[in-house]
Curated annotation (Swiss-Prot):
SUPFAM superfamilies: F-box domain. Residues 1-49 form the F-box domain. This is Probable F-box protein At3g22720. InterPro entries: F-box-assoc_dom_typ1, F-box-assoc_interact_dom, F-box-like_dom_sf, F-box_dom, SCF_F-box_component. It comes from Arabidopsis thaliana (Mouse-ear cress).
């Protein structure tokens, strides 16, 4: 029997079993359960086990798995049942934003709380936001550092904006705070995060993606009229400004992460052309080595909000947004190489454009992203 095997051999075998299969073993053997909770083992498992890549989508304030069938014409999207989590009234919790980090989801809710959630294990951790949270436009990101035992210590970055329209000219503030899971459960102001003045009060930062523990965000400098890539290092707790690829016509942009690759999509409002660049080189100080993906496609879909999922192997882009018009629709787009497919799939009822105001109290945009189940515990 496997339970009689030496522990090191059991560990070697189980470290190569997918996470969704391993979670069912937690209740079968006390010895295995202890191993699966070992943080050293979960780190080893994350790097050695097959990646069960899935596509998740935030729609109607809940998280849904979706599957895409490219073997039919036109391609189709199938929405599965919403993911559930350990909460007495989970169906009543309204999720307004989601940030993914190696199998953990950082969700913002409408009751001034954050929840860190591992859907694979069903574990959650609720975090109360500050009482004055609603005074700001806020962006949250989840990341981690590796401690001396090569185990992860998680942190949450809070980026906020404040506006004072009573002053002349109107004043705009920008601040950063951090929440450490290993601390006394309080928010800490970051005074030196912007050490090299990579951003200022004229910078607009968008919600980003997580890669290797750090957060990558798109940013826009109002004074310079330029876009750039911003990286927050959770170890040094500082921002770093990075270069984007050279686009012929800088337009609307989105970021995506899959299999330790960062993708940036650029969509031209002038030509309606879409192009994608990818990189997996993160060792340079400021200049990333970008590679252009040959996915030439035209899309007449002016966007208000959007998010991106890119599959390089299948040369397919999925993204969701609100289509422009007098009455706006929430739509999933499937776009293939050389206009191989182009399809719009509405996924909620039409809503009036007046409700699509960019304010932090109303969130109507949805998210689509790559998700890989993991055994990381929320500590």
């Amino acid at each position: 029997m496997m339970s009689d095997l030496p522990l090191d051999l059991v560990e070697k075998i189980l470290s190569r079993v997918p996470a969704t299969s391993l979670k069912r073993l937690r209740s079968t053997c006390r010895r295995w359960n202890a191993l699966l909770k070992d943080r050293r083992f979960t780190e080893k498992h994350f790097h050695k086990a097959p990646k069960e890549s899935r596509v998740l989508m935030l729609k109607e304030y809940r998280v849904f798995p979706i599957s895409v069938n490219l073997k039919v014409t036109p391609p189709s999207v199938d929405f599965k049942g919403a993911l559930g989590y350990s909460h007495s009234n989970s169906e009543q919790v309204v999720i307004t934003e989601v940030f993914h980090c190696d199998g953990l989801l950082l969700c913002t809710t409408n009751d001034d709380r954050l929840v860190v959630w591992n859907p694979c294990l069903g574990e959650t951790k609720w975090i109360q936001l500050k009482v004055d949270y609603r005074r700001y436009v806020s962006i949250f990101a989840l990341g981690y550092i590796q401690n001396n035992e090569s185990c992860r210590s998680y942190k949450i970055l809070w980026t906020w904006y404040s506006y004072d329209y009573n002053s002349s000219p109107p004043q705009r503030g920008l601040g950063f705070e951090i929440y450490e899971f290993s601390s006394d459960s309080s928010w800490r102001v970051l005074d030196d995060v912007n050490h090299d003045s990579v951003v200022n009060h004229n910078s607009i930062i968008r919600s980003g993606v997580s890669l290797k523990g750090n957060t990558y965000m798109l940013a826009y400098d109002i004074e310079e009229n330029s876009k750039f890539l911003l990286m927050f290092d959770f170890t040094t707790e500082r921002l770093k400004r990075l270069c984007l690829p050279h686009f012929q016509d800088v337009g609307e942009m989105d970021l995506s992460v899959r299999e330790e690759q960062l993708s940036v999509l650029n969509w031209s409002r002038i030509t309606s052309k879409m192009e994608i660049w990818i990189t997996n080189n993160f060792d340079t100080e400021a200049t990333l080595l970008w590679k252009r993906v040959h996915l030439d496609s035209q899309c007449n879909c002016v966007r208000i909000f959007s998010s991106l999922y890119f599959d390089e192997e299948k040369k397919v882009v999925l993204y969701c947004n609100v289509k422009d018009g007098e009455t706006s629709k929430k739509v999933v787009y499937i776009i293939g190489e050389d206009d191989g497919h182009y399809i719009e799939i509405p996924f909620v009822k039409s809503i009036k454009i007046e409700r699509l105001q960019l304010i932090h109290t109303t969130r109507w945009y949805s998210l689509i992203f790559n998700y890989v189940p993991s055994l990381f515990q929320i500590q």
